[in-house]
Structure formats: structure tokens, C-alpha cells
Amino acid sequence: TCTVHEQLNDDTFTAGTHTGDVKSNIRVENTGTYPAYVRVRLVGRWVNGAGETVGGVPSRLPAVKLLGGWLAGSGDTYYYTTAMAPGDMTGVLCEPMVLETGTGLDGSTSYQVVEVFAEAIQAAPEEAVSAAWGVTVTDGVITAVQ
């Protein structure tokens, strides 16, 4: 198991949906009892002032500038390249993301939300990681995403 840790406008969150201007310091903690690899998927959407999803507005993500230790996969999925011991936390995923404010189809203000979904898989055996996630693991490091 794993938990996402992130900041939004310098406030720290570990779960839930939050709106704001800048999302930063996205990290994942291995909360399981075995060494594990982790990956995250970013999902963008728009909400109104009450936090309700706004329909009819195409979702998109801000530009993601990865930091060290992460590899980009398909479908806005990112892989931490090394297995983590229980209790360890990944390095920060990316540079801070600036979230947009827009206008809904009805003219109301809408706010961009980026949700971070994390997934962990037991690190041993490496072949299981490769088969389940379609990655290449070399000497304990994810070196390629297929």
C-alpha cells in the first residue's frame, strides 16, 4: 500500500481533492510491509466553487516537468525508478504545477484540479513487476517503460 503526500499553495495534504493555484512536492510513501515500486497517475478535471465537477469543459493537465528518479509512461502515468523500503518516501515527482482558473459553459468560474492516484507493487520478484506494469527492471531499477 502507499499514500500520496502533496502540497497545495504550501498546505500539506495526504488524501482527498483540493483546489488551488500551485500543486507541488508530490511524493509517495510506501505504507506497506514489503519493499515496493510505486507509480502515479495524474487525472485532471474542472470544478466549480463548491467543488462539484463541471461538465462540458475538456480536462487537461498542466505541463509536467519530471524531477530525478521518475520515468514517464503512457496515459499520464509516472514510475518511481527504485524500489522503496517500508516507510520510505519517493523523491518529489515534478516541478510545481500551476493550476488554472477558467470559465464553465454557463459562464461561471471553474477551477482546475489535478488528482494524484498512486499504486504500489511488491518489489520481488522483479519479473512480476515487469509483467504487471510493462516495465524493464535492470539491477533493481526501472530503466524503461514499454
Regions found by a protein language model. Give the residues of each.
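Long, small/polar-residue-biased beta-strand-and-loop interaction regions
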Residues: 1-146
